[in-house]
Amino acid sequence: MAQESCDLNKDEAEILKPSSSSSPSPSPTTASPSPPTAQMTEPPPPQSTPPTPPAAAAAASAAAAPQFSAKNCEGILIEVSKKRKLAEATATDANAVVVAAVAEPLSPVLFVNRCNVCRKRVGLTGFRCRCGELFCPRHRHSETHECSFDYKTAGREEIARANPVIRAAKIIKI
């Protein structure tokens, strides 16, 4: 099995296989068996260690660093993505708080458990109309709250679905 290592300099960890003089097996993530340095499109960020030749760096990392298996890299990938998602979530939450603070005085106050007509608290006895609003027992009927739902058209469609038009086949009379 070829040696695998994790490149943690990128945002997402990838499994990179170092090039060797023996016959390299094709990587499932890449189409060409070129070395990992040729696959990188952007330069890696500067590190605190002095730069070393690629062959010496591969030999030093193989001798000194523990070898990572695919499972370890997947765990690191998950941790990195969780951290990134958490950072994005906190950034969007901060933006949402600023937007909510600006928009809060302008937005109307919504009452969830109140009648839409008389603003009486309905609790568990509220009636949800077909127009989507909540009403008390006095205003639950469509005539009392000027309902926008078209009951006549809905009734016609329901009857048409329940009673399809049946036409008899033509009979040839002799």
From Swiss-Prot:
<feature type="zinc finger region" description="AN1-type">
    <location>
        <begin position="109"/>
        <end position="155"/>
    </location>
</feature>
<dbReference type="InterPro" id="IPR050652">
    <property type="entry name" value="AN1_A20_ZnFinger"/>
</dbReference>
<feature type="binding site">
    <location>
        <position position="136"/>
    </location>
    <ligand>
        <name>Zn(2+) 1</name>
    </ligand>
</feature>
<dbReference type="GO" id="GO:0004842">
    <property type="term" value="F:ubiquitin-protein transferase activity"/>
</dbReference>
<feature type="binding site">
    <location>
        <position position="147"/>
    </location>
    <ligand>
        <name>Zn(2+) 2</name>
    </ligand>
</feature>
<feature type="binding site">
    <location>
        <position position="115"/>
    </location>
    <ligand>
        <name>Zn(2+) 1</name>
    </ligand>
</feature>
<feature type="compositionally biased region" description="Low complexity">
    <location>
        <begin position="18"/>
        <end position="41"/>
    </location>
</feature>
<dbReference type="InterPro" id="IPR000058">
    <property type="entry name" value="Znf_AN1"/>
</dbReference>
<feature type="region of interest" description="Disordered">
    <location>
        <begin position="1"/>
        <end position="61"/>
    </location>
</feature>
<dbReference type="GO" id="GO:0008270">
    <property type="term" value="F:zinc ion binding"/>
</dbReference>
<feature type="compositionally biased region" description="Pro residues">
    <location>
        <begin position="42"/>
        <end position="54"/>
    </location>
</feature>
<dbReference type="Pfam" id="PF01428">
    <property type="entry name" value="zf-AN1"/>
</dbReference>
<keyword id="KW-0863">Zinc-finger</keyword>
<dbReference type="GO" id="GO:0016567">
    <property type="term" value="P:protein ubiquitination"/>
</dbReference>
<dbReference type="InterPro" id="IPR035896">
    <property type="entry name" value="AN1-like_Znf"/>
</dbReference>
<feature type="binding site">
    <location>
        <position position="129"/>
    </location>
    <ligand>
        <name>Zn(2+) 2</name>
    </ligand>
</feature>
<feature type="binding site">
    <location>
        <position position="131"/>
    </location>
    <ligand>
        <name>Zn(2+) 2</name>
    </ligand>
</feature>
<comment type="function">
    <text>May be involved in environmental stress response.</text>
</comment>
<keyword id="KW-0479">Metal-binding</keyword>
<feature type="binding site">
    <location>
        <position position="145"/>
    </location>
    <ligand>
        <name>Zn(2+) 2</name>
    </ligand>
</feature>
<protein>
    <recommendedName>
        <fullName>Zinc finger AN1 domain-containing stress-associated protein 15</fullName>
    </recommendedName>
</protein>
<keyword id="KW-0346">Stress response</keyword>
<keyword id="KW-0862">Zinc</keyword>
<feature type="binding site">
    <location>
        <position position="118"/>
    </location>
    <ligand>
        <name>Zn(2+) 1</name>
    </ligand>
</feature>
<feature type="binding site">
    <location>
        <position position="139"/>
    </location>
    <ligand>
        <name>Zn(2+) 1</name>
    </ligand>
</feature>
